[in-house]
């Protein structure tokens, strides 16, 4: 199997059908569809039993609610494909997405490439983050973001073995981990093959994670701190390192187990970020109390 299209699902029965239809319309069928249901309380289980297809394998698994990143870890364990393509339950693919991915895989030049990456578009056809002038390039994700100054979410397709080597950290008392943890870890070891073609349609919903991300991070401070501490140690602009340490302290004040802080090596200058982090934490608390 060449590709695993992986969908973590939680109470998205009203959008999954659109994704299913887009998969059936693919011009190249060389994939399986793997769904991990993260404890949905709507009719997602019943709906997924109807997604039988003579075109491609459909596999459905239901797990106890632990959050999207835990579902991704489970999906990587179960995947049969060489490449792992995370497609959220409220998004869908253009008809030629898998055809384009198949063609781009054949154009990979470096053995260090661990990720294929195309563009995400809004339903209107506009690229998320604005238009770009390049055709294709192989580089680290850090170079692509900060040297080429590319903005906006992208559509990453990762070698399954690479995902398995860089699983998200999980904690029994937390249900969230920033997706940047996975991609930063991969970028330190692997190149990405970028190509300037749309392979993903994205629509941000008002009940999605991005709509209430501050509250979510406050409720999962351990994973959030890991993200910001690791990001600050990456080859990123100094301004981003400063913001990372400010956010490290900001969400560190949400920790119930203060001993968790001992696992981090905090540079001396990062203590200057303590006060702005505390001020942002106070603002977050006041903002949440008003809601």
Predicted regions and their residues:
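A conserved acidic beta->alpha catalytic loop
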Residues: 22, 37-47, 88
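Short aromatic/hydrophobic "clamp" motif used to bind/position activated sugar donors
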Residues: 84
